Amino acid sequence: MAKVLVLYYSAYGHIETMAYAVAEGAKSAGAEVTVKRVPELVPEDVAKASYYKVDQAAPIATVDELADYDAIIVGAGTRFGTVASQMRNFWDQTGGLWFAGKLVGKLGSVFTSSATQHGGQESTILGFIPTFLHQGMVVAGLPYAFQGQMGTEEVKGGSPYGASTITNGDGSRQPSEIELEGAKYQGAHVAKLAAKLA
């Protein structure tokens, strides 16, 4: 049974919702799944004043525990076309794991969100993939076998690089059913691949 970590950062709850959908998909494929988040870097008073969702139930991850999993599925919103600094900061602390080769051969995957359809989702996912490759990890996305990412009948996130959601500039749009299905598919896809690699 593959051990999968869904590791996320979510300021307003959209990525948190996607993370649990990813976890559901991974569990459906037989994986042992853990959902954790990275630490918040914004001072608590500023976060509350900015209406961040500060009451998230997932425990905080530690860098060293990354080595305990067969696959790590990372989720974070895009910030100006790249991954949120909270997630970047967490992975910037993995030098010891890199030096010891602790993540070599493990599977990595990414999902994200943005306020607009062209708000940097693909650049965020593609920009994170080198982190996995430097660690010696194998990368998986969201294959076109998930047909939900096809078509133009509605506004929706998702690409072959990974699941995603569009939130609107005011954060009022929650992940749609098709976006959550994409997240579940990605979780299941990664879990199946991780079981083969483990």
Swiss-Prot record:
FMN binds at residues 10-15, 78-80, 113-119, 134. Signal peptide: none annotated. Keywords: Flavoprotein, FMN, NAD, NADP, Nucleotide-binding, Oxidoreductase. Residues 4-190 form the Flavodoxin-like domain. It comes from Rhizobium johnstonii (strain DSM 114642 / LMG 32736 / 3841). One of its GO terms (molecular function) is NADPH dehydrogenase (quinone) activity. It is an enzyme of class 1 (oxidoreductase). Pfam families: Flavodoxin_1. Belongs to the WrbA family. The keyword Nucleotide-binding applies. NAD(+) binds at residue 12. It catalyses: a quinone + NADH + H(+) = a quinol + NAD(+); a quinone + NADPH + H(+) = a quinol + NADP(+). Its cofactor is FMN. Substrate binds at residue 98. Its EC number is 1.6.5.2. GO terms for cellular component: membrane. InterPro entries: Flavodoxin/NO_synth (IPR008254), Flavoprotein-like_sf (IPR029039), Flavoprotein_WrbA-like (IPR010089), NQO (IPR037513). This is NAD(P)H dehydrogenase (quinone). Binds 1 FMN per monomer.
